[in-house]
């Protein structure tokens, strides 16, 4: 039986927004609404969906960057023998949790301090957690720069972020994340702002590091091709809810939910003569059905560990 590095149960994140400048009335936006998933050690889950569906909000809640409204998030205990709720963490345990869960942000141009050298940027988490002495920390920086392909490291350590290309900056972001030797990394579209020519090299780097360092990923993307390349499983998110989740090849070859079918049919095909079915989905009707039937019932297994939301989707295709 597989051991999970993280288990998410009925996670919710709501925001209150004002109805207008002169109005005191507030409405609740359900950015993340009752989602459940788990990620085993050494595996990656792709979280896909359109912009604004709640992917990044989910990531920030898992990393304790934003407080969740409800639900449970259980992370593996430091001894690896049991799970522990992140709500119970405090003091030294909370500090260890932050070492074991890290995040790679989308924009390498904004996630690095422009006034710091590359050496200082990567040293920062080691300094915060007081890991090793100065010589050991500098040696660790040199080793991780070599690991992410920035060699020789002594040429990069004194540089500033503006002196690097986009791909090199993202490698620095990855180095800063992995120098803590985390067990779980949230990747918020880390290749979406990079040129296509270097995107594949960054993804290959992340896959190799995941294998070598036994890291699990939650990989957020709107690109199904990227999710297929990076992930063991894919969860499809729509308006704050997960509507379908399955093994990667199972989901892409046998999509069931109409929104998943619509996403897959929107993938560009290089052959202009290729005739494929395009699914036309009434999103307003779909959203109302999910709101009506999807909140208080668990997802159902339709076989091959392929789960789908239990609302009625007939007639929506």
What are these regions (language model features)?
Residues 2-4, 18-22, 28, 83, ...:
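Short catalytic/signature loops enriched in Gly
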Residues 159-164, 168:
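Conserved ABC ATPase signature
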Residues 72-96:
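ABC ATPase NBD Q-loop/coupling interface
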Residues 227-229:
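A short, surface-exposed alpha-helical micro-motif characterized by mixed small hydrophobic
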Residues 179-183:
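A short, proline-enriched helix->beta-strand linker immediately N-terminal to the Walker B motif
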Residues 174, 202:
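Hydrophobic anchor residue at the start of the ABC signature
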